[in-house]
Regions:
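Catalytic phosphate/metal-binding cores of nucleic-acid and nucleotide-processing enzymes, i.e., regions
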Residues: 1-99
Length: 99
């Protein structure tokens, strides 16, 4: 009988915790946003040395979809010249910290 391969599901909260840890390791701030009445607003506001401010949406690596509301916020903020990031994994965190 063949063995079944189980893939560990990575939760959004796991990615979010890693993002916070890595941002704070650079001396930055990674604030959780609770925007009451603002459906689809970003999960985190990141402030990095420089200063650089980035609005960030965190999604789980597999199956985490950006909603229409979230996409709308991202498009609007980017049109205003505000950096926006969608983070799904460690590679995305690396890219955010290097940009």
């Amino acid at each position: 009988m063949a063995k079944l391969a189980f893939v560990k599901r990575v939760l959004e909260s796991t990615i979010e915790a890693e993002l916070k840890r890595r941002v704070e390791a650079t001396g930055g701030i990674c604030e959780k946003v609770r925007a009451i009445g603002r459906r689809g607003f970003f999960d985190r506001i990141i402030i990095l040395p420089g200063p650089r401010i980035i609005f960030c949406e965190v999604k789980r690596p597999r199956g985490g979809r950006v909603s229409e509301h979230q996409s709308g916020y991202a498009s609007h903020y980017e049109a205003l010249g505000v950096p926006v990031a969608i983070v799904r994994n460690r590679e995305d965190i690396d890219a955010l910290l290097k940009s």
